[in-house]
Amino acid sequence: MANTWWELQISCESALEDSVSWRLEDFGCRGTASESKGDSCLVKGYLPIFQAQLLDLAALGLWLQQDALCIGLSSPTLTWQLIDEEDWASSWKQYWHPQEIGDRFLINPAWLPSPENSDRLIIRLDPGVAFGTGNHATTQLCLESLEMRLSEVPKSFISKGGNQEPVIIADIGCGSGILSIGAVLLGAQKVYAVDTDPLAVQSTFSNRALNEVNPERLVPAEGSVDILKKLIERPVDGIVCNILADVIIQLVPEISEISKPSTWAIFSGILVEQSTSVAEALEKHGWVVATMWKRKEWCCLNVRRT
């Protein structure tokens, strides 16, 4: 049974899609997929059989009902079944299609041909079991924020000869590597990508090769900020971090140690109601929130050093 997975299926109102996806990820699902049909939505999540028993699944059903009740929507319906690993690895792919994000990106599933004559930056992606397909609001907000940051080069990044200084970025909680690859395509000279999940790091390596990114420009590693401190030669110019709010708050002191006065950062994975707590933690360690972008119940904080 080691290669057997739970497939969880949640039928819900479309307005609950992000909330259900977040709940599944928090529950430990290694991958999620969703399909919208009018005002309704089917969200699927996958996790190894050893990670949950039937009582755990019943508790998940109650949490989903409570989440819906809190925002005045009808309760979702949760069903589950056991599937083999081979079926799990391919079952969600039928729901994922090419997606434009922001003004410049196109996320293209690796198993589909790349569109011809596109003027967008194409990220070919096979997330495997890692978070980050471009479907989630937080990933979209981070990519759009990277567009803004890397198209507006600060004067401090311009050398005396008028040339742009190389931009070094840290991606904390890299997942599939989608944000790291996006940063490289936008012109970042080098991205250090870390994740505590070894499967996410493996996915980033695979997607780096899939997009033919020079290994010198994208360096994945297992770990967190402690590993970044060993990898980087100097403080980074930019930081992108799309993980849960509680984890961001815990990491803020360490993140500040790898920054310099001109460093900017992008934080997401934050529910709107959690934004104040995250902003307060950042301000205590010398950061100021420049803008907060919202999408559905999620937000993204664009910050800089004070």
Swiss-Prot record:
GO terms for MF: protein-lysine N-methyltransferase activity
Annotated InterPro entries: Ribosomal_L11_MeTrfase_PrmA, Ribosomal_PrmA_MeTrfase, SAM-dependent_MTases_sf
Pfam families hit by this protein: PrmA
Catalysed reactions, semicolon-separated: L-lysyl-[protein] + 3 S-adenosyl-L-methionine = N(6),N(6),N(6)-trimethyl-L-lysyl-[protein] + 3 S-adenosyl-L-homocysteine + 3 H(+)
Keywords linked to the UniProt accession: Cytoplasm, Methyltransferase, S-adenosyl-L-methionine, Transferase
Any Gene Ontology biological process: methylation
Uppermost EC category: transferase
Gene Ontology annotations for the cellular component aspect, listed alphabetically: cytoplasm
Domain of life: Bacteria
Keyword S-adenosyl-L-methionine carried by entry: yes
Compartment(s): Cytoplasm
Primary location class: cytoplasm
Gene3D superfamilies linked: Vaccinia Virus protein VP39
Residues the entry annotates as binding S-adenosyl-L-methionine: T139, G173, D195, N242
The enzyme's E.C. designation: 2.1.1.-
Keyword field contains Cytoplasm: yes
Family the UniProt entry places it in: Belongs to the methyltransferase superfamily. PrmA family.
PANTHER family: ELECTRON TRANSFER FLAVOPROTEIN BETA SUBUNIT LYSINE METHYLTRANSFERASE (PTHR43648:SF1)
Protein task: Methylates ribosomal protein L11.
Protein name: Ribosomal protein L11 methyltransferase
Native source species: Nostoc sp. (strain PCC 7120 / SAG 25.82 / UTEX 2576)
Lineage of source species: Bacteria, Bacillati, Cyanobacteriota, Cyanophyceae, Nostocales
